C-alpha cells in the first residue's frame, strides 16, 4: 500500500459511482446531439472519464469474493438488482422499457463474473490452490460464463467476465500488484481504444487499504437503477412503451 494516499472500499465505490454517472450522462443525454461540436467534445471527455468505473467494480467484486460469508445471498442480490435495473437500462439507452434484442445491463456481467469466481474457489478448495485440475476446470468454467455473457449480450460481454476473473487471479502473483492490475485491464483495452483511459485506476486500486470503510450496501446497489431511470426520464420523458 502506498504511503500518503489510501482508499477504503467505500472510497473506491464512491469514485466508481461518480465516474459511472458522468459516463452515462454522456451516453444518454449527449449522444443524441453529437452533431453539435461542443456536445461531441463534452461527450468524449465524459466517456473517457467513465472508462474508469467498470474496472473498479470488477476489482471490488473480486475482493468481495474473499470476504463474503454468504455467497448465495451475494449472487441473489446481484440477480435481483440486475432484473430490477433492466427496464431502466433499456429506457435510458433506447427510450423504451423492453427490448429483447438489446444488450443487458452490467449487473448481469458482474453476476456471471461472481459465479466464475465461486466455481474457481470451489475447485481450489477441492483440488488445491495451485492444482492443475483447479486451474483447467476453473478456466473452462470462466470461458463458458464469458461465452454466456456474449450470448446474452451483457454490457462489456466476455471481456467483462474475464476482467473480473483476472482481478481475482493475477494481482497476488506479482510482487508489485500494479503489474497485476495492468494485466487484468488488458481484455478491456483490447475491446476499445478508449479503454486505455481506465489505466489510472491502477493507482487508485494500489491505494486500496483492504478496509471496507463506511458502507450502505443497499444504497450502492439502488443507485444503479435509480440514476438510469432519472437519466432516461430526462432524455425521453415518460412514455409507456
Question: What residue spans do the PLM features occupy?
Answer:
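Alpha-helical transmembrane segments and their immediate juxtamembrane cytosolic regions
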Residues: 1-241
Amino acid at each position: 500500500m502506498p504511503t500518503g494516499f489510501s482508499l477504503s472500499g467505500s472510497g473506491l465505490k464512491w469514485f466508481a459511482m461518480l465516474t459511472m454517472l458522468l459516463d452515462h450522462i454522456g451516453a444518454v443525454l449527449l449522444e443524441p446531439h453529437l452533431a453539435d461540436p461542443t456536445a461531441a467534445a463534452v461527450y468524449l471527455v465524459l466517456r473517457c472519464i467513465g472508462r474508469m468505473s467498470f474496472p473498479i467494480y470488477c476489482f471490488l467484486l473480486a475482493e468481495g469474493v474473499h470476504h463474503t460469508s454468504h455467497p448465495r445471498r451475494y449472487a441473489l442480490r446481484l440477480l435481483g438488482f440486475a432484473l430490477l435495473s433492466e427496464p431502466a437500462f433499456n429506457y435510458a439507452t433506447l427510450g423504451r422499457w423492453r427490448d429483447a434484442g438489446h444488450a443487458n445491463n452490467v449487473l448481469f456481467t458482474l453476476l456471471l463474473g461472481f459465479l466464475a469466481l465461486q466455481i474457481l474457489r470451489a475447485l481450489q478448495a477441492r483440488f488445491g490452490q495451485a492444482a492443475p485440475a483447479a486451474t483447467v476446470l476453473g478456466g473452462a468454467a470462466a470461458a463458458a460464463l464469458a461465452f454466456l455473457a456474449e450470448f446474452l449480450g451483457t454490457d462489456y460481454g466476455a471481456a467483462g467476465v474475464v476482467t473480473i476473473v483476472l482481478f481475482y487471479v493475477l494481482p497476488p502473483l506479482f510482487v508489485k500488484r500494479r503489474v497485476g492490475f495492468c494485466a487484468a485491464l488488458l481484455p478491456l483495452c483490447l475491446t476499445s481504444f478508449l479503454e486505455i483511459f481506465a489505466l489510472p485506476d491502477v493507482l487508485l486500486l494500489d491505494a486500496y487499504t483492504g478496509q471496507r470503510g463506511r458502507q450502505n450496501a443497499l444504497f450502492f446497489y439502488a443507485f444503479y437503477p435509480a440514476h438510469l431511470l432519472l437519466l432516461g426520464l430526462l432524455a425521453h420523458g415518460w412514455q409507456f412503451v
